Amino acid sequence: MMTNLQYYLDTFRVSVPQLETLTSTALSHGGDFADLYFEYTTFFSLLLRDGEVSAGGFHTDFGVGIRVLKGEKTGYAYSENTEMSDMLKAAEAASAIALGTDSRMTYTSVTDKKNCFYPDGGNWRQMEASAFLPFIRNLEKEIFSKDSRIVKVIIRLSDSVSDVMMFNSLGELTTDSRPMGSVTATAVFQQGDMTENRSVSRSFRKGVQMIDDALMHEIASEVVRDIDARFEASRPKGGQMSVVMGAGASGILLHEAMGHAFEADFNRKGQSVFSDKMGQRICPEEVSVVDDGTLLYNRGSGNYDDEGVPGEKTYMVRDGILTSYLHDRISAAWYGISPTGNGRRENFRYNPIPRMRATYMENGNADPEGMIASVRHGVYVDEFSNGQVKIGEGDFTFFVKSGYLIENGRLTSPIKDINIIGNGPEALADIAAVGNDLKIDNGTWTCGKEQSVPVSCGMPTVLISNLTVGGE
């Protein structure tokens, strides 16, 4: 995290008096609150396919977004340069939202807290493309060496660094430098006339030091894990049954099926199934659900959100009780509470809205093997792909790529290509056991609620007593 204010002022070619002029202009028609979001981002990627390496590209993005809030209305405009004349035009455009609007909301300063969740990540820009070639070629070689059935390997390495500066009408001035490194490897396996593929990704808010032998060995080993089961797997008969969710990537179901319903914009508008449940028990006592912006080097973490609010660890559910929604400044002002650091945006062209960061369920006390042993008939699932969720009703459907049948307390036949169908509140209420093996999945998770932002997820092993499994 860079703390040298002059670096940011020089990067965006502005002065503090100019920032004050812009916010004054933005409030010239009587808005309640105004803020400026400056951003300079560099992106780089390399792709290895069929043994050939190509530069996926290097590009930059630069600009400022200006927001005005009046009551529950938002005015937003942006400029792709920081010439004062163009920024003043954007501020004037955003200020028009206040015309003819009498309603007001009160915004207060947030705690002046200095976070540092990615302390050594700013060195991507100093590296030449050639510095990464040994890593991706050695990773390709190691993956091929793991299994003779591999016929193709594709590897993508990418990095970005975003320098942001935020200023608002409360006088808060915040800066942050946000690194992101990602590696994705895909292997295609051929066995007779059958083909399977497996992709593994890792992503962190780290600098180039993340590209090391340990990461290479981890990815290569994970790509070939359980591939025999993939070739043997079949679709089971569907129906109502117990489902054991494996630790780690199963957290995506928590994110999609339940996490979005905890975002405050849906709740203040009465659109979430949890809108009237604050302070009530919504699941068993052993369940606590967290959205965390403070995990060191995590893809979803942030020293500050995109409104300049310090990152924090927010308990949405504690001991089975709904205790908090996920707030940006607007929803926090509406509820009369402090924001939780969840105001996020894709880039300066977008208005911030409540978004998750790293969402996970905390550890319980149950033994994962004991959970499986307790199930007479059900499925164990550990790898998901896409899903659909209805925020208002809480209904969800998820596609499961791999897992196992559970028969008489034992994992038996491998399964694939099934759907898990349920309802978020009902699934929470039907949690029968929470394991003691919490795992955060460090894949390249990206949430697409109106905009794309990096997130993370995780879970311990969890037993849900009753879900619909869509199979044969």
Give the label of every model feature segment.
Residues 1-472:
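N-terminal small-residue-enriched
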